[in-house]
Design a protein with these regions (language model features):
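Catalytic phosphate/metal-binding cores of nucleic-acid and nucleotide-processing enzymes, i.e., regions
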Residues: 1-119
Length: 119
């Protein structure tokens, strides 16, 4: 039986929601083309979460999702984007999610690497 194809974006939505984030997709697909446009040039998902146990107000974040092997390229892209700097200065956060398949004996499982992007 073949494994169904799940995108990094779908994996991140499921992971974030399981960890208490409220999530929405903000990347746009171009009709009749195989291209997507990220929000502000770097965001696939917009999410927010409150941290009452930490005594902190809610966080808002844009999430860039990718494969584990493509994280460095995505980080470089984000850091080169002037709107990313403005987003961070305005109090938003940027989270980079890199997904990779790992083997645990006969089982194959997906693992996320999270990286908060800062100036």
């Amino acid at each position: 039986m073949r494994e169904r194809k799940i995108t990094p974006t779908t994996r991140s939505i499921e992971w974030l929601e399981a960890h208490g984030w409220t999530v929405d997709i903000v990347e746009r697909r171009v009709p009749h083309a195989f291209i997507t446009h990220d929000a502000f040039g770097f965001g696939d998902l917009l999410c927010f979460k409150s941290f009452p146990d930490r005594g902190q107000g809610p966080w808002i974040a844009l999430v860039q999702t990718t494969t584990g092997s493509n994280m460095a390229a995505r980080r470089t892209k984000i850091l080169a984007e002037s709107r990313a700097r403005l987003w961070l200065q305005a109090g938003g956060r940027i989270l980079l999610h890199g997904w990779r398949k790992i083997s645990k004996g006969p089982l194959k499982t997906w693992e996320v690497r999270e990286e908060w992007v800062t100036l």
